[in-house]
Each structure stands twice: as C-alpha cells, then as structure tokens.
Amino acid sequence: MGRYLKERNPAVQIIAVEPDGFSALLGLEPGLHVIHQIQGIGDGFIPSVLDPGLIDDVITVSDDDAVYCTRKLSRTLGLLVGTSAGANVYAARILSARLGPGSRVATVLPDRAERYFSTALL
C-alpha cells in the first residue's frame, strides 16, 4: 500500500505504528518479545511484505491509549475493531495534530473485535 501511494504522490508520508517501549522498526533487536496488549503489531519481527525503506516515521502508542481509542471507536461510532486499529487511529490523531490544519491523514482499521468479545476490551 505504501509503495502504491508513494508512486502516485512522492510527498506522501508513510508512518508506522508500534507499541510503546518496543519497535523493531526503530532498531530494537528483532526477536525480542515485549509483552503488550496491542495484538497484531510489535511481534518482534519485520514482516517480509514490509519494506522498511518506505517508512518515514514511527509513532509508538501505549497500551492504555490503544485500548481507550478502541473503546471510543466502539462506543461512539459503533466500530467493533481490535487494539491495533485503536492504536492506528490514536497515532493518526497524533499525526494530524503535528501536521496542523489543512493536512490529510488516512489510516487503516486492520482487524475486527469478534475475537475480543470474551475479554474486558469492549
């Protein structure tokens, strides 16, 4: 997705999201597993489908912020998503504040909440 966007507009910035205190993308030793609550990201490796050369920056998000945003998406917008989606939206809000008025920020919501129904998440 990042390559496609940059081919269409070289000014596009690709921002990765990682759990707070851990980021293989920021140079933490790959394979080091840190316990966090944001399922689906920060698993201690860089996936083969990811080209780190396309990433312009990394925003880290705490467990609490990811869970808060996930719950807010559910309660205010009816979006039943998981914590990686909550982390992405939280990071998008941080980026939007950094870039200021008139900027455009897009993100993806990569998961759904059905696997979390038996947890305290929702």
Feature roles, as predicted:
Residues 7-83, 120-122:
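Active-site/ligand-binding loops adjacent to catalytic centers
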Residues 2-9, 96:
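Surface-exposed amphipathic alpha-helices with a cationic face
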Residues 20, 86, 111-113:
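Short glycine-rich anion-binding loops that position phosphate/pyrophosphate groups of nucleotides
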Residues 1, 84-92:
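Short glycine/serine/threonine-rich phosphate/pyrophosphate-binding segments
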Residues 44, 90-122:
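Phosphate-binding loop/pocket of nucleotide- and phosphate-handling active sites
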